[in-house]
Amino acid sequence: MTNALLHPFAPVAKPMSDYINIVRGSGSLVYDDTGKDYVDGLGSLWYCQVAHGRTEIIDAVADQMRRIEAYNIFDPFTNEPADRVAEMIVERSPFPDGRVFLGCSGSEAVDTAIKIARQAMQRRGQTERQVVVRRTNGYHGTNFGGTSAQGIAPNREGWGDLVPHFVEVPHDDL
């Protein structure tokens, strides 16, 4: 364990001895460095939970890594895995002509959605339409836009000015 890692939502001065060091996973279980097992019911917040140690996924990832592990898709580049994932998402969506913006996390997705919504209004000439509605107790990530969008007040505190133009409604108000 290291003090070099800043854990989200943890007190900065939290002692290293208070952390549970997860060292491996199998199926729906993860194990700490003492051998104790835990049900991984979080899906880890940062990725889609598909269970740990699945050999078919490990083999597919290893095969892809042998060809090319990754490459950016900034204009003018693309790559076959990114194209394939985008097509799979559009095929499963209700929008046959849909387009996909690939990101790395839910936090990044929230920030990008805010940007796209505001850009759409700018392009329509409706520059005054900048308000984003958030719900009380809604969690939308740790990035700047997601922190601004979330309805958990303590998570928005201590950062200075956040992204403006959010209004909050009760979580159960349709």
Predicted regions and their residues:
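Active-site-adjacent loop/helix segments that line or gate small-molecule/cofactor pockets in enzymes
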Residues: M1-L29, G43, R67
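Acidic surface patches and DE-rich sequence motifs
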Residues: D32
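Glycine-rich phosphate-binding segment of PLP-dependent enzymes
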Residues: Y38, S44-L45, Q49-P76, R84-C104
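Short clusters of small/polar residues that mark proteolytic maturation junctions
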Residues: L42-G43, V132
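Short acidic-aromatic active-site loops that bind/stabilize oxyanions
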Residues: F74-N79, P170
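PLP-dependent aspartate aminotransferase-fold enzymes
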Residues: E87-L174
